[in-house]
Amino acid sequence: MSNSILSKLNVGERSPVNRTHSSRTEAEKSSLFRFVRRKINSPWLACVPLTALIVAIWNAAAIAQDTEIVNITVETVNENVATLQGTLNAIWILIAAILVIFMNAGFGMLETGLCRQKNAVNILTKNLIVFALATIAYWAIGFSLMFGSSGNPFVGFGGFFLSGDHTNYGLSPFPEGLPVAVFFLFQVAFSATAATIVSGAVAERIKFNEFLIFSVLLVGIAYPITGHWVWDAGGWLYTMGFMDFAGSTVVHSVGGWAALAGAFLLGPRLGKFVDGRPGAIPGHNMGFAMLGCLILWIGWFGFNPGSQLAADQACAYIAVTTNLAASAGGLTATFTSWLKDGKPDLTMVINGVLAGLVGITAGCAGVSYWGSVIIGGIAGILVVYSVAFFDKIKIDDPVGAISVHLVNGVWGTLAVGFFNMEKGLFYGGGINQLIIQIVGILAIGAFTAIFSFVVWAILKQTMGIRVSGEEEMIGLDIGEHGMEAYTGFVKETDSFGSAVSGATVPE
């Protein structure tokens, strides 16, 4: 019995009293667990708002810091964009300057092709050396007379030998970041163009030394003074509102007036006028002439768009108006010479293209596409009749430089008063701009013509400007340079020394 009782006690058969006590104990343990858990969790629950506050403060600080960083970044980006734009401007103007400088090769090819082979070396030498002379003369005094900020409305002064900065030359209107050196190079290319124009009109009879002297004075004094009137912000024509975007007058008419004075005082070539009537003296290489024209056409895409002085979208518009005018000039000159003389003359086609380019140069940035076609088309017609006119009055111009650059430089400058989309007469701008254009043409023409005539006359009286008749007959290649452009060829000439054919030397 005792074992049975023990087994019951040890095996676990509990009485109802024991089961009740056990249930109460478990409930108490559960309640205690929940109590303890609540006590333990309460501090962590209190940390939730604090944590949220810390996170909010952290985010606010981060946002403020990010805003500051964004502001700094925007300022840095703007500075970098401005610097990049300035660099692009400088690169574009440098490329444009190189294109304009290469136009000297075009002038050399054009003039050589339209003249006789016995004068080819002389013409090539003049076109090459004139750029070197122009660079030195314009560097020494020309750039300062044109843009020096210490001058007055009639002439600039200060910063000779390119010794100043933007403040010395008054370049503040020009785009930010454009170096003075780049602007100088672009302008010196323009100045050389004015002197090169003269070379063609006085070709085949001008003394080499005297031509160089005149070129230095033109580029160093006359061209910068009139250029100051128009392109410097303090110039009197600039203040008046005269418009010549890329130089129909400042470059081309100036060169044309100087050429006219020189051709007049030189007189015609031997054999040009027989019994008072003009005779043809054909050029020796039309291939050279055509190639020269094409080089000039390409170079004009630096000449006109480069005058924007910035690498922006306006350059493309200017390039299109320039190309349209050149094309229209070439076409109208072709058909005009065809109708006038019965056949299309290649020399007139060439001069028509160049006339269109000269004509659009003043207004290329401010006329419509249709306006550029009309301006170029009229220029092509003018050049054909202008060449005939100067022949009639016995002004001998071997390459038609006066007709291309002077006549159409004047026309292109006048055309601004008609076709400019803001101030032109045909666009409701009234006659005021046209009057201003006429004043500028007359003022620059009078100054340049008088200056050139006086200088040529002094040179003629003191040193002589024309080679001897014998030297002209032999050719300036031998007389002035002691060499020939084409060795190994026999040159057949007419009674006036004009080469009419060539043949290889027989063995």
Swiss-Prot record:
Gene3D superfamilies: Ammonium transporter AmtB like domains. Residues 1-23 are annotated as: Disordered. GO terms for cellular component: plasma membrane. Keywords: Ammonia transport, Cell membrane, Membrane, Transmembrane, Transmembrane helix, Transport. GO terms for molecular function: ammonium channel activity. It is found in: Cell membrane. It comes from the Bacteria. The chain crosses the membrane at residues 44-64, 90-110, 128-148, 154-174, 178-198, 211-231, 245-265, 286-306, 315-335, 347-367, 370-390, 399-419, 438-458. Coiled coil: none annotated. GO terms for biological process: ammonium homeostasis; ammonium transmembrane transport. It is a multi-pass membrane protein. InterPro entries: Ammonium/urea_transptr (IPR029020), Ammonium_transpt (IPR001905), Ammonium_transpt_CS (IPR018047), NH4_transpt_AmtB-like_dom (IPR024041). Pfam families: Ammonium_transp. Belongs to the ammonia transporter channel (TC 1.A.11.2) family. This is Putative ammonium transporter sll0108. It comes from Synechocystis sp. (strain ATCC 27184 / PCC 6803 / Kazusa).
